[in-house]
């Protein structure tokens, strides 16, 4: 596999990192807007939703990024990038919805979670398949 074949997953990784940076900045802006100064993490529901988006996205990145790269390497980098783009869309919809109301976050959460699960399970199955092929020789 060449570096060129991995450009799309690399782009998705860079975009996911940029998305996370924007979410971190949003927390800083929300702190100022709602008067919740560090180290406090509670005190205003609107602020707490903005903070929760950032926390949850960090949690999801720990699952998403390994899945993206393992799928790209052991299955298909183009499909990995497409699923990664779906994850990004899901995270954006999740943030947009959650910023408005907790009840509005589920579509984005489901979209992001489903794409992550496909990446991780697909990567695992591809790795197991390749290990099985090696053991047959």
UniProtKB/Swiss-Prot annotation:
It is a multi-pass membrane protein. The chain crosses the membrane at residues 5-25, 79-99, 109-129. InterPro entries: MAPEG, MAPEG-like_dom_sf, Membr-assoc_MAPEG. The keyword Cell membrane applies. One of its GO terms (biological process) is leukotriene metabolic process. Pfam families: MAPEG. One of its GO terms (cellular component) is plasma membrane. Keywords: Cell membrane, Membrane, Transmembrane, Transmembrane helix. The keyword Transmembrane applies. It comes from the Bacteria. It is found in: Cell membrane. GO terms for molecular function: glutathione peroxidase activity; glutathione transferase activity. PANTHER family: MICROSOMAL GLUTATHIONE S-TRANSFERASE, MICROSOMAL GLUTATHIONE S-TRANSFERASE-RELATED. Belongs to the MAPEG family. This is Uncharacterized protein sll1147.
């Amino acid at each position: 596999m060449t570096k060129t074949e991995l450009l799309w997953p690399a782009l998705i990784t860079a975009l996911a990192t940029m998305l996370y940076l924007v979410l971190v900045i949003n927390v800083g802006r929300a702190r100022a807007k709602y008067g919740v100064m560090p180290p406090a993490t509670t005190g205003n529901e609107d602020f707490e939703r903005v903070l929760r988006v950032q926390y949850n996205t960090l949690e999801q990145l720990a699952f998403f990024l390994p899945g993206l790269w393992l799928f790209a390497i052991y299955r298909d980098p183009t499909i990995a990038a497409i699923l990664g783009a779906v994850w990004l869309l899901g995270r954006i919809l999740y943030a947009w919805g959650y910023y408005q109301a907790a009840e509005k976050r589920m579509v984005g959460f489901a979209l992001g979670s489903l794409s992550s699960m496909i990446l991780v399970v697909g990567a695992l199955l591809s790795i197991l398949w390749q290990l099985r092929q090696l053991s047959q020789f």
